[in-house]
């Protein structure tokens, strides 16, 4: 186990909990959080749709409401406003609700920006353009003024180029891949279809993510959860193995048993390979030691002395040491295991 954790560290995988490394060999379901894990996590505003106003007006109101937010989507909106040279007005009475959106007073009017949960909360109707945008896999944010939709923003987050290979490699190893996101179902299913993921939990609030992990566990699955945000921490703690990517928040990293130094989702496959490889070595060493001692101990005890076969004490001592040496050398072979994510996925395809 110590060699396995050392080998993992050299490959950019920090094993905080050795039991987590052991459990990875039995994982049969990996639950990926979409944003920042399967996607780059650097969203950009791809399009603006306005109703009764100009695009710049809608973007300006959205940027004003999002000024005090630290969410990646808020930063994308503010970047887009700056790129278009829009002067963002000061907002007051800011509030934020996870998986719902933000709200603020701008020039005395309540401006809200959010996804499908916001529309449900305000009993507002989604703009028709959102259906077209959803098919592209983009996140759709509606902008409301005093509870009425006045526009929508299409926010795209590029899928990591390594994500498809990670999903395929896990599937080839008999692992079910599941995606979880707070995005609307149409958006989530579009991304999942692009990645080849068949099962999706969409529209999930942050506080409900741990419940989805439990749902998989009730099906008899051993679940690994992969995430990077504060909202993922309860789910990471609930999973049989919590895996935080290196770019994740301190809370997510603190809740995980395994931490990936990089942001390549294929590293999850590397951890599974390491866990299975370490288990194979343990079994080999156990069978070797048991078989060796089954033969050597009776000989050393003189069971064949009546037949004239005896072992000098010096030979017995050497044979005793030989068993330990063989076990140690066999364990050292773990150092030769190539855990480079690209190499691991290539080996399976070959």
Name each model-derived stretch:
Residues 1-34, 170, 192-193, 201-202, ...:
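Hydrophobic alpha-helical transmembrane segments
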Residues 81, 91-101:
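Short, solvent-exposed loop/turn elements at beta->coil junctions and helix N-caps
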Residues 28-70, 100-178, 257-258, 329-337:
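ATP-driven catalytic headpiece of P-type ATPases
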